[in-house]
Amino acid sequence: MNKMEHMEIKQLVVSMSLPIIISMVIQALYNIVDSIFVAKVSSDALTAVSLCYPVQTIMIAIACGTAVGFNTLLARYLGEKKFDYANNTMMHGILLGLVNGLVFLVLGLLFSNVFLSLFTSDQNVIPLANTYIRICTMFSFSVFVQIIFERIMQATGNAIYNMVMQGAGAIINIILDPILIFGWFGLPEMGVAGAAIATVIGQFCAMLIGYVITKVKIKELDIHMRNFSFSTPILCKIYKVGVPAILMQSVLSFMTVFMNMILAPISAMAITVFSVYYKLQNFLNMAVLGITNALIPIVAYNNGANRKDRAIEAIQFSMILSIFIMAVGTIVFQLFPKQLLAMFSANDQMYGLGIPALKIISLSFVFAGISMVLCAAFQALNKANTSLVITLARQLVILIPLTYGLMKCFGIHVGWYAFVVTEFICTMYSLFECRKMKR
């Protein structure tokens, strides 16, 4: 019995989204754990790590976008029982991960100073941020290859191993962070460098676990260079799907860069507050993204099978779940902003900027949840352009100019309302497009 067509919709959405949510939340832990421990070193150290966040998001965007194209092609060859092509595709994916890591190693060594100079001239912060960026980019091959192994497991129906791999990496990172940052057990106190080293060790261990699982458990595939034969068509097929996915994923990276540029003239602490907000909010985003990632194949399958009733029910139930998650998040941000900031060793300046920011921006959460679900539904129903327009408007086209204008004219606290206005406009547009489709 095909569960996509016959399993009860609520059970189907939950069963498919839960492993994805867990994997995504674990991924979000890397940055937030670093920030919590680094904040105990100094506010300059936290600012330094915050400035590096866009670099990490662009690496993840390229890794995940490449992996989307890779996963699509690998799954197709496995479905067609073309195992030689599948093995060659797998080897291309792993080698692409290594090449992408090499590119970021070079970029990190050559251009980290140029990148950081866009946001700050503080000589207390720049050396710390430089150290963090260079360590993370030097060993970035780990995260690129790790994400390829994740997609291998998804394509072969072994998604449960993702949680093992990512969970192990996150736990190693959490254990090593205080040891390396504060110099426990006789080790030298490394501060920001220790946080970066803990992160890359966690990612490297996760990559190794992914390799072992693929080698031992995935019987359909065989990791070996004898299965590799350079193929331009395979690369083109990977990036035909991968490039649009990279661009979609990169929107967040560009948004954080532009926001940092808007906030830099106000103060370095304003950048830190925004980074802390985004890392906290990312837990909610990851939960909703887990739901939407599960929703897309459910809606696409049932729409294709002419079971539009099930497709509509899946969208409605996903909407309810997302609104609930975002509403809970809004309540937490409204009632406990000081406690949330306290995790990052906040000082009076951070509280003064951060408490209003968390309270104001959180008013946009429910609208964001609705837009994210409808964007996923549009993708599943072959309305990818509509989804792209909404995503660009939410993250760049409306948000950035509106934030800049409000902050320039009325100050930073009023500027945060740009998030609320943007999400409201995009939700209204999403609902309008939804009504058009119903007609």
Language model regions located:
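Residue-level hotspots within the lipid-embedded alpha helices of multi-pass solute transporters
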Residues: 24-28, 61, 101, 105, ...
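Hydrophobic transmembrane alpha-helices of multi-pass small-molecule transporters
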Residues: 58-61, 173-178, 207-211, 283-286, ...
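N-terminal transmembrane alpha-helices
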Residues: 4-36, 40-41, 57-69, 73, ...
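Short alpha-helical transmembrane segments in multi-pass integral membrane proteins
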Residues: 1-17, 74-141, 189-243, 299-364, ...
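Helix-terminus/linker motif at the lipid-water interface of multi-pass membrane proteins
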Residues: 25, 29-47, 116-123, 179-190, ...
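Small-residue-rich hydrophobic transmembrane alpha-helices
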Residues: 46-109, 143-162, 271-331, 335, ...
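Transmembrane helical elements of multi-pass membrane transporters/channels
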Residues: 15-34, 135, 146, 169, ...
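Short runs within selected transmembrane alpha-helices of multi-pass transporters and secretion channels
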Residues: 67, 136-154, 162-170, 195-208, ...
